[in-house]
């Protein structure tokens, strides 16, 4: 029997998603389409009459703006919001800023898929000569991180390793206390939570594509195990198209 409900949403399309570039920790804006996706997600939540008590997001504006759109569209702007770097997207290291299709043409689709989808193989690290090094590694929003916490690149395994402690220590107690939680974050940090909730294998989580801007609903029992598969809020066609679009990103044009 379900005793808790959790809602998660991957941010709407960003300008770099639109350009098919590896985004990671670069603070890209939502595209026009991404803004519309966030508003559509808000409408789906409003239509489902869902209310929340506390919200969590990353420190990247594409996720924050998605959350804002949902809170605005559901008239819940007053809710407390916790922002944390631990829910950031996976750090794509030296690939940050590169067009995925061009990278596939240069290195081969298989290598790009390994970098994007392998569980424990990180991309090349971002060094000090990288054009986005200063705007990420020297950014004051990360000034409070302890030595060794700021990544220069991450595998999916690394991303999950820094997201899950926040889930376990901060979010889980709120859910167990009966709070209705909304998380607006990124494809890979959310994958970490999904993998943990569903007990998925490393291989299975690599194949999971979370669509942008479409709310994901979990009904959980008191042990925080799903009582049924994840549900998407939205019409079937919207969900199917979104998941196909995500899967197609790493292919050479």
Swiss-Prot record:
Catalytic reaction annotation: (2R)-2-phosphoglycerate = (2R)-3-phosphoglycerate; (2R)-3-phospho-glyceroyl phosphate = (2R)-2,3-bisphosphoglycerate + H(+)
GO MF: bisphosphoglycerate mutase activity; hydrolase activity; identical protein binding; phosphoglycerate mutase activity
Tissue: Expressed in the heart and muscle. Not found in the liver and brain.
Modified sites of kind Phosphoserine: 14, 118, 135
PTM-bearing positions, type Phosphotyrosine: 132-133
Active site as annotated: 11, 89
Pfam families: His_Phos_1
UniProt GO BP: canonical glycolysis; gluconeogenesis; glycolytic process; Notch signaling pathway; response to mercury ion; spermatogenesis; striated muscle contraction
Database matches in InterPro entries: His_Pase_superF_clade-1, His_PPase_superfam, PG/BPGM_mutase_AS, Phosphogly_mut1
Gene3D superfamilies recorded: Phosphoglycerate mutase-like
Superkingdom assignment: Eukaryota
Modified residues (Phosphothreonine): 3, 152
Disease: Glycogen storage disease 10: A metabolic disorder characterized by myoglobinuria, increased serum creatine kinase levels, decreased phosphoglycerate mutase activity, myalgia, muscle pain, muscle cramps, exercise intolerance.
NCBIfam families named in the record: pgm_1, PRK14115.1
Name used for this protein in its record: Phosphoglycerate mutase 2
Record organism: Homo sapiens (Human)
Lineage of source species: Eukaryota, Metazoa, Chordata, Craniata, Vertebrata
Gene behind the chain: PGAM2
